[in-house]
Amino acid sequence: MTQKFEMADRFNPSAVEQALYQRWEESGYFKPSENENAPSYCIAIPPPNVTGSLHMGHAFQQTLMDTLIRFNRMEGHNTLWQTGTDHAGIATQMVVERKIAAEEGKTRHDYGREAFINKIWDWKAYSGGTISQQMRRLGNSIDWERERFTMDDGLSNAVKEVFVRLHEEGLIYRGKRLVNWDPKLHTAISDLEVENKESKGSLWHFRYPLANDAKTADGKDYLVVATTRPETMLGDTAVAVHPEDERYQSLIGKTVVLPLANREIPIIADEYVDREFGTGVVKITPAHDFNDYEVGKRHNLPMVNVLTLNANIRDEAEIIGTDGKPLAGYEATIPADYRGLERFAARKKIVADFEALGLLDEIKPHDLKVPYGDRGGVPIEPMLTDQWYVSVKPLADVAIKAVEDGEIQFVPKQYENLYFSWMRDIQDWCISRQLWWGHRIPAWYDAEGNVYVARNEEEVRSKYNLDSAVELKQDEDVLDTWFSSGLWTFSTLGWPEQTKELKMFHPTDVLITGFDIIFFWVARMIMFTMHFVKDENGKPQVPFKTVYVTGLIRDEQGQKMSKSKGNVLDPIDMIDGISLEDLLEKRTGNMMQPQLAEKIAKATRKEFAEGIAAHGTDALRFTLAALASNGRDINWDMKRLEGYRNFCNKLWNASRFVLTNEKLDLSQGEIEFSLADRWIQSEFNRTVETFRSSLSQYRFDLCANAIYEFTWNQFCDWYLELTKPVFANGNAAQIRAASQTLVHVLEKLLRLAHPLIPFITEEIWQKVKGFVGITADSIMLQPFPQVEESGFDPEAEAEIEWLKEVIVAVRNIRAESNIAPSKGLDLLFRNLSAENAKILEKQTALLKAMAKLDNVQVLATNETAPLAVAKLVGNAELLVPMAGFINKEAELARLTKEIEKYQNEVKRIENKLSNEAFVAKAPEAVIAKEREKQAEYQSGLEKIQEQYKAIEAL
């Protein structure tokens, strides 16, 4: 029986991908089942910012996640990929503030809190769909009905629940402590949002007069204090020296007079001081420096805050004790000349006034790192403010033990050390932010300033027995974004309700994320989850069993991708293509630093002179997987993307070749499998084994490589060719066997590759399924190929490998001797082993067909060969008689190269064996193997040299 079949010449991703995805989604293939007893598999996506768009890092991580999800779905697991977006407090608020400033010339204060928040919700509704549409374009098999947003009602309830419970347990408190303060945005920000920039600054050396006629060891009546922050000196409450610094031993415990403020402050000893820095004397300003804050706590120093929230000098200093409460009885007047000055104007005036008083000793150039807010773009100030904190140490201890005990594995393992180093030195976490957009802190204040914490105002009144006449005002602050995203794995599954989803899918299986948020997000998820989610035995649950840490996607030069560098690549542009003009507009439009536009445009024109061609989603996904070597940063490579687009085309063309073959016979009847049929099935079985083993170790690169190698090099380049003689000259049983092998291996190959390249595999599979008698609707729901223990055929593998070497040797002789592929050749074998002679005897017809040979002959031991071109395959010598077609000069040149190759190998092994250290350390078996190789190369060299002499004598 033969089948007529039509198939397009080329695979057109743009015509197929979106329609296929829509069908998958509408058919409900992405949804988990309701079966609570089925083995489950769950991944919670790291939620992207709701106002953003996907970048290459998202595409990279999501490709890996979808590969795992699709694989596990095909394995029969009840699979949930939980998706959603993050409200991203500060980022989203800034986007909308910039938008209303540009379009309406208004600020958020013109709107007021409630109206401005409504404006953000409008923006979220408008832009929030962008990310989910882009994720669909990537082929992500997500149950969209379960999509969550970190400010959904359900998640907001979970946030309030966690806050209230932690407060009731004494683990959340309000206090005045030092935070990173952004004076432009008027909010505390996390360390993650601080960018330390290299700066050419100064180190000022000021003289602080000693009080009460004290003198230094060398007779001076002042100490020289080195500082990079003159503007904060009005808040100094001590100067410090190292306890073992002999220069200042006699002065410890005495005082200096703080210039300009005319206030006595103590000289203290603390090991924090670096004796080599400046003069070895530093000013201590606990209200304006994180290190000084710790020194101040150790020595019970007052904290004198001299800056407003705008970073101007205050009219009156705020004086706070180490307990965070106002401190009475300590005088710290700010001189009138400095009140209201902007911080850097105050710096200039203070330096000038020191100089006028003769107290400026010297100014030295000094390189330093200045902390900037990554969004406000101005230097941040360590600032004493009232904030809410989580006391995380008790939570951290449990989270550390979970990783120590192996309940959570990091891949690669070295990231455990990074996790431990952070967690073992953990500080209380500032969770309040002075923003309008976010989860408002569930705390209320009465007129006297008493604080009441509860889930809502109604609960406050009942919990604290407050009369309805008592006026309450909710805290204005919102929670750090990381607080709500720390609940992500369980809040999205319905917690605090004990839902069936929570029972079925928690703990999740793997988290795929970047190393830069291990502390800010991963660690906090572990702490919160283990504190609040328990199994049926009351044991704390982990949020995930494995953390797979990816590297960054960089550009081709290894630079980090960023808008300011103009080197950002949009994954959708890799899929659909983009013109040079549109790419230039995308990279240079709406820039924060327009002066960089011309430089960026020039670099873009050079790199993408023709714009970017369309490659389709599968090529992008396959490239990302192939580049995913464990934990390393990845340099993006457009050539690899082009290469994998060609790979997709190769798979399409091979499928077309198989399915449109008019001689394909899938009828019932006798079958006779050839050596090639047995070989390709064994090779496929090995590929399945490699894929499964690699995926279990999160080696996505090895998975991609296994599929590429099998598809391109074994199936397309060899097996399809090996079947051509069968279809041309085989009997009915052989043709049936080749036909069955072709379509069944192709169908299984599509299933194997589907998790990585879902669109093209589904499109081809829909055409293949009828050939193999499958009536199912989608490849997604088919079982993933298993390793079949009986499916290995080492004998067939060895025989085909030998035949391939012979065929390649003959083809090389043709190429090197410029012999037309169509010209029939004779092939002689000399020194052929009994084992290979048997293969040759059985497979002569195949060899003749594949290598275009007229005659094949094995020479007797002492038989003289005619003048011939020779190649070695193992120990066997292949000879193609030269009569009538040899080019003497070309053949001598070829043999010279062969002689050099063999001489180099002989020399290399001789050097190895004459190396005493190698011989002393290497096992006997290794040395014996090297000697065996040496003898083989020496023998081969002699044969080629003989051949050279024979041709030279012509």
Swiss-Prot record:
Cellular localisation: Cytoplasm
Main location: cytoplasm
Cellular component terms per the entry's GO annotation: cytosol
Short motif 'KMSKS' region, span: 560-564
Binding site for ATP: 563
Motif annotated as 'HIGH' region, chain positions: 48-58
Coiled-coil annotated spans: 883-953
UniProt-recorded Gene Ontology molecular function terms: aminoacyl-tRNA deacylase activity; ATP binding; valine-tRNA ligase activity
GO biological process: valyl-tRNA aminoacylation
Enzyme class, UniProt record, top EC level: ligase
Matches recorded under InterPro entries: aa-tRNA-synth_I_CS, aa-tRNA-synth_Ia, Anticodon_Ia_Val, M/V/L/I-tRNA-synth_anticd-bd, Rossmann-like_a/b/a_fold, tRNA-bd_arm, tRNAsynth_Ia_anticodon-bd, Val-tRNA_synth_C_sf
Pfam families listed in its UniProt record: Anticodon_1, tRNA-synt_1, Val_tRNA-synt_C
Assigned keywords, A-Z: Aminoacyl-tRNA synthetase, ATP-binding, Coiled coil, Cytoplasm, Ligase, Nucleotide-binding, Protein biosynthesis
Reactions this protein catalyses: tRNA(Val) + L-valine + ATP = L-valyl-tRNA(Val) + AMP + diphosphate
Its EC number(s): 6.1.1.9
Entry note about domains: ValRS has two distinct active sites: one for aminoacylation and one for editing. The misactivated threonine is translocated from the active site to the editing site. The C-terminal coiled-coil domain is crucial for aminoacylation activity.
Stored PANTHER family: VALINE--TRNA LIGASE, CHLOROPLASTIC_MITOCHONDRIAL 2, VALYL-TRNA SYNTHETASES
Function field: Catalyzes the attachment of valine to tRNA(Val). As ValRS can inadvertently accommodate and process structurally similar amino acids such as threonine, to avoid such errors, it has a 'posttransfer' editing activity that hydrolyzes mischarged Thr-tRNA(Val) in a tRNA-dependent manner.
Known partners and oligomeric status: Monomer.
Similarity comment: Belongs to the class-I aminoacyl-tRNA synthetase family. ValS type 1 subfamily.
HAMAP family: Val_tRNA_synth_type1
The name this protein goes by in its record: Valine--tRNA ligase
Source organism of the structure: Haemophilus influenzae (strain ATCC 51907 / DSM 11121 / KW20 / Rd)
